[in-house]
Amino acid sequence: MKLQKPKGTQDILPPESAKWQYVEGFAREIFKRYNYAEVRTPIFEHYEVISRSVGDTTDIVTKEMYDFYDKGDRHITLRPEGTAPVVRSYVENKLFAPEVQKPSKFYYMGPMFRYERPQAGRLRQFHQIGVECFGSSNPATDVETIAMAAHFLKEIGIQGVKLHLNTLGNPESRAAYRQALIDYLTPLKETLSKDSQRRLEENPLRVLDSKEKEDKEAVENAPSILDFLDEESQAHFDAVRQMLENLGVDYIIDTNMVRGLDYYNHTIFEFITEIEGNDLTVCAGGRYDGLVSYFGGPETAGFGFGLGVERLLLILEKQGVTLPIENALDVYIAVLGEGANIKALELVQALRQQGFKAERDYLNRKLKAQFKSADVFVAKTLITLGESEVESGQVTVKNNQTREEVQVSLETISQNFSEIFEKLGFYTQ
């Protein structure tokens, strides 16, 4: 049997992995500016954590979950999204306690799992970066979080992004709209896709989100949620829109956008960009004020978003965006002769301990092959260390781009290479 990765997964290898590290590091830097701290939750949860919060009737739960019974007969699922595990952790660890600063701001990043048809930018094991903010029902929190997502997408280089905005109102507004939608769609039931006929019975708002042609035609003249907002819901949505305008964040009202998870209320949003004629959602989220209490905590407001790393990288690639990744070696040591082996090891270690990215030859190859390796590694400087250099204690350090050389002692390299590095035209951090 040929051993290979499971369908819908990938090996992320160098140099591709450097792009992942850059995106993750960039996200951490942006989130830190907004006072978010990292939280790490298990990749598997009790089945009920996901099914009850995401919604028993959602596609995630009915079709896409990886769930199983473990050896203790506990019903376990691999996490298909990030919000429910973070909320479970928030409640379990009593982060709602008075001594914990509010609002509480967390971010996460890591693998998620859904059993769906693998395609470009969508895998069965995929990676998500997300944020969750607890304890503020202020519409300014909605806007700050949306603005943070916009800030991240703009600075990382995504082009042509449009913010789609909607509201689901409070539970009362949503219930009134739900009934109006049922009344509108029931006479059209036979024209809907099989999935949407099922959704009409279980969660009619999801019909609005369908990508099927017949469903899109059916909802073209459907009632709008904006006509069913009560005073509180309308005031919240108006405030969100006004503050976005104050910050100069453009948006499009999209009343057919409902998001695929049942826990949202009030503001929901998606950042969408067009790639090769197709609209791709790069980041999405919204408000979920009832989820913490649903998990057994006190009534607590919540707001967050998630974005898929695979999709983000796909969009950057399609848009021709090159991430500023530093791959170059600072120093490469070419080693000539067995007598130089130990000194080369001491030297490369001393360079690394001074903060330089350094490598040496270990394969006893001809110098020409070692110089080629230095070029492949885009080494800034090159040291050739043979037995005669070890005996004399002197060595030549070459700028591998300009070919400029300086003669220095091995002791200087071991103790103060930054002086030589700068003399050859490079600058240390």
From Swiss-Prot:
GO molecular function list: ATP binding; catalytic activity, acting on a protein; histidine-tRNA ligase activity; transferase activity
GO biological process: histidyl-tRNA aminoacylation
Enzyme Commission number(s): 6.1.1.21
Pfam family, one: tRNA-synt_His
UniProt main location, coarse: cytoplasm
Location in or out of the cell: Cytoplasm
InterPro entries (alphabetical): aa-tRNA-synth_II, aa-tRNA-synth_II/BPL/LPL, Anticodon-bd, Anticodon-bd_dom_sf, His-tRNA-ligase, HisRS-like_core, HisRS/HisZ, HisRS_anticodon
Assembly: Homodimer.
Protein name: Histidine--tRNA ligase
Encoding gene, per UniProt annotation: hisS
